[in-house]
Regions:
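Conserved beta-strand
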Residues: 7-10, 17-27, 58
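Walker A (P-loop) phosphate-binding loop of ABC-type ATPase nucleotide-binding domains
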Residues: 37-41
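Helix-to-loop junction immediately C-terminal to a conserved catalytic motif
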Residues: 50
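Conserved ABC transporter NBD signature motif
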Residues: 58-68, 74-75
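ABC-family P-loop ATPase nucleotide-binding domains
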Residues: 77, 83-139
Length: 139
């Protein structure tokens, strides 16, 4: 069976934290959740997989592709990540987020996005900083 994610010996060091020699595989068709204490490295691992930060060592393949390869940016269009909270600048609102996502994802569908905004009862013009934690998770 092929793996959707292969992480081999990945390390990342910050001033006060080290993710050391992480190795894991996720078979295709599987769903994975990362659970752990605050500061355990869950968000760092996701950022490494999505190539939002670079590892100090090791390798990461996603869908059979090195996540640092030029084609990975296009492959990210088909990858879903759900974080515990959205990390948008505090002054943005739902309409601003739509514009950013439209520029980020080729397949972005504003009608579907605003359908979910309505379904989840999120105010389109309210600043992100004024959202509750639950509202941020929905966004």
């Amino acid at each position: 069976m092929k793996n959707a994610i292969d992480i081999k010996g990945v390390s990342k060091t910050y001033r006060d934290f080290t993710l050391d020699s992480l190795t894991l595989s996720l078979p295709e068709g599987s769903i994975m959740g990362l659970i752990g204490e605050n500061g355990a490295g869950k968000s760092t691992t996701i950022k490494l997989i999505m190539n939002a930060i670079l590892p100090d060592s090791g390798s990461i393949e996603v869908l059979g592709m090195d996540n640092k390869s030029p084609g990975f940016a296009e492959a990210k269009e088909d990858i879903g990540v759900v974080l515990d909270e959205a990390y948008f600048p505090v002054s943005l609102n739902c309409k601003n987020v739509n514009k950013i996502m439209g520029l980020t994802y080729k397949k972005w569908d504003p009608d579907k996005y605003f359908g979910y905004i309505k379904k989840f009862g999120l105010p389109e013009k309210k600043a992100f900083k004024d959202f509750s934690r639950g509202m941020k998770m929905k966004l």
